[in-house]
């Protein structure tokens, strides 16, 4: 087959026009040293702080240190097979995690990858792990209640949607139980819960997931797990991944609750990374920016303004103290960032007062505005009464002859302490709480033996539900006690006592 000269030139021209000269330029570097989950890399001159990189073995890393001749990269994986001289390439993007309804009911790692063997997560959207917290104008003050189902908290240290309330105490004082109870209490309230486990034993996390499944709470819960055996980098990232997932629901006019269990281990993971990256240590060997580590995380919880959809993200960070020392570095930092704290005490826990909440040291700085009026009416003097009871109790140990008024106050105090006790995983509705606290503060329990108060309470709710259902209904709808309702409640309690004591 012969071509004419002009045909040949047109074919060559056509081929040149069709030629796809798509050249991809990659910026790569070489590992100088790798140890303890951190790689020092030479050659990534244009790398940016927080940028993602990819190692030869396919594992991802995150740039944290920018030095004169090298960059410090934390490895987001085991780092096996990485050695000196291995190549590293820039990905020119920041870390994103999957968000959305597809994650509900799943257990994921700090990168949003499933670890529950329930298949792939088909996420509709990915969001940056590091986001700037909302500004002042985008927020609204906390005014809606977030019921924990725990009498002592809802009555004395109420939590509102969009609040940050710290749960603080020594190990084995029931901190996680308070958080899990709060998650269980959100059933049927259209609140998405996120439980972030940082540096926990895998057996402990498995137990938490089992409890949540048992009470039907996994239907609206996401569990983010960075266990004790995971690299420090993943433990550092886990809370940020969790809050990013929570922000998705908040920004879509929904309500979310996030639990960080716990931020003490989070700070330890960050300290470990910082020391390996040779950043100068400060107080208790923590780096200088450990306050910013937690403030930028907790500031992302908020109640949005009506213009932005009025969604909310409530945070319950947990801090573990050593021998009740709340004046250590991390506890004081987080106390100053949050809107109040629930202080759990070993002595109370061991003496059978559970939840072991120290009412004197616990406070909610903004939750009062969110408390329903009925609870406020019945528990108005409760904090003062309990404080006076504690004072009298200390005095009564030394003085045997107390006057009648003091003796009565002491006896009522004992009964109120008993009323505020609650078994784990049994949250109470606000109307049930109002009824039993009303009974205690108005003296209906004064002639009930302290040991019988638990039985009295257990029998009271079904009795009112059967005989006076309108009491619960009115508290639910009106959210306040009027004269008529108080009279009905007094009548119901008198009738119940006559039949059951």
From Swiss-Prot:
It holds the Pfam family ATP-synt_ab_C. Belongs to the ATPase alpha/beta chains family. This is ATP synthase subunit alpha. Produces ATP from ADP in the presence of a proton gradient across the membrane. The alpha chain is a regulatory subunit. It comes from the Bacteria. The record marks 362 as: Required for activity. F-type ATPases have 2 components, CF(1) - the catalytic core - and CF(0) - the membrane proton channel. CF(1) has five subunits: alpha(3), beta(3), gamma(1), delta(1), epsilon(1). CF(0) has three main subunits: a(1), b(2) and c(9-12). The alpha and beta chains form an alternating ring which encloses part of the gamma chain. CF(1) is attached to CF(0) by a central stalk formed by the gamma and epsilon chains, while a peripheral stalk is formed by the delta and b chains. PROSITE patterns: ATPASE_ALPHA_BETA (PS00152). It is a peripheral membrane protein. Its EC number is 7.1.2.2. NCBIfam families: atpA (TIGR00962), PRK13343.1 (NF009884). It comes from Campylobacter lari (strain RM2100 / D67 / ATCC BAA-1060). It is an enzyme of class 7 (translocase). It is found in: Cell inner membrane. GO terms for molecular function: ADP binding; ATP binding; proton-transporting ATP synthase activity, rotational mechanism. The keyword Mitochondrion does not apply. Keywords: ATP synthesis, ATP-binding, Cell inner membrane, Cell membrane, CF(1), Hydrogen ion transport, Ion transport, Membrane, Nucleotide-binding, Translocase, Transport. InterPro entries: ATP_synth_asu-like_sf (IPR023366), ATP_synth_asu_C (IPR000793), ATP_synth_asu_C_sf (IPR038376), ATP_synth_F1_a_nt-bd_dom (IPR033732), ATP_synth_F1_asu (IPR005294), ATPase_a/bsu_AS (IPR020003), ATPase_F1/V1/A1_a/bsu_N (IPR004100), ATPase_F1/V1/A1_a/bsu_N_sf (IPR036121). ATP binds at residues 169-176. GO terms for cellular component: plasma membrane; proton-transporting ATP synthase complex. It catalyses: ATP + H2O + 4 H(+)(in) = ADP + phosphate + 5 H(+)(out).
């Amino acid at each position: 087959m012969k071509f004419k000269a002009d045909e040949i030139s047109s074919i060559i021209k056509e081929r040149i026009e069709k030629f796809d000269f798509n050249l991809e330029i990659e910026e790569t570097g070489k590992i100088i040293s790798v140890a303890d989950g951190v790689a020092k890399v030479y050659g990534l001159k244009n790398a940016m702080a927080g940028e993602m990189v990819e190692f030869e073995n396919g594992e991802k890393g995150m740039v944290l240190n920018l030095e004169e001749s090298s960059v410090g990269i934390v490895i987001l994986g085991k780092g096996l097979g990485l050695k000196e001289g291995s190549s590293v390439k820039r990905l020119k993007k920041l870390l994103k995690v999957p968000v959305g309804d597809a994650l509900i009911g799943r257990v994921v790692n700090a990168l949003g990858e499933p670890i529950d063997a329930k298949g792939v997560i088909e996420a509709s959207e990915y969001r940056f792990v590091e986001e700037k917290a909302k500004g002042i104008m985008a927020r609204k003050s906390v005014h809606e209640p977030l019921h924990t189902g725990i009498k002592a908290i809802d009555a004395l240290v109420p939590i509102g949607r969009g609040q940050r309330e710290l749960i603080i105490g020594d190990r084995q004082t029931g901190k996680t139980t308070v958080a899990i109870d709060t998650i269980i209490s959100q059933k049927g309230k259209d609140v998405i819960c996120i439980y972030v486990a940082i540096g926990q034993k895998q057996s402990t996390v498995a137990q938490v997931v089992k409890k949540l499944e048992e009470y039907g709470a996994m239907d609206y819960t996401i569990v983010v797990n960075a266990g004790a055996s995971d690299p420090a980098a993943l433990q550092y990232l886990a809370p940020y991944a969790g809050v990013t997932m929570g922000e998705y629901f908040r920004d879509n006019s929904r309500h979310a609750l996030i639990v960080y269990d716990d931020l003490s281990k989070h700070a330890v993971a960050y300290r470990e990374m910082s020391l390996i990256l040779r950043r100068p240590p400060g107080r208790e060997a923590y780096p200088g920016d450990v306050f910013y580590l937690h403030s930028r995380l907790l500031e992302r919880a908020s109640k949005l303004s009506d213009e932005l959809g009025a969604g909310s993200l409530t945070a319950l960070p947990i801090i573990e103290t050593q021998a009740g020392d709340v004046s250590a570095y991390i506890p004081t930092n987080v106390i100053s960032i949050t809107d109040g704290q629930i202080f759990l005490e070993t002595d109370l826990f061991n003496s059978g007062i559970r939840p072991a909440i120290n009412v004197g040291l616990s406070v909610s700085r903004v939750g009062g505005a969110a408390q329903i009026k009925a609870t406020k009416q019945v528990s108005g003097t409760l904090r003062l009464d309990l404080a006076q009871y504690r004072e009298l109790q200390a005095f009564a140990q030394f003085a045997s002859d107390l006057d009648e008024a003091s003796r009565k106050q002491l006896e009522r105090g004992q009964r109120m302490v008993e009323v505020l006790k609650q078994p784990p995983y049994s949250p109470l509705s606000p109307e049930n709480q109002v009824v039993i606290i009303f009974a205690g503060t108005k003296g209906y329990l004064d002639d009930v033996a302290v040991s019988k108060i638990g039985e009295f309470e257990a029998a009271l709710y079904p009795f009112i539900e059967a005989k006076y259902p309108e009491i619960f209904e009115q508290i639910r709808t009106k959210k306040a006690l009027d004269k008529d309702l108080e009279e009905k409640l007094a009548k119901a309690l008198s009738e119940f006592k006559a039949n059951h004591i």
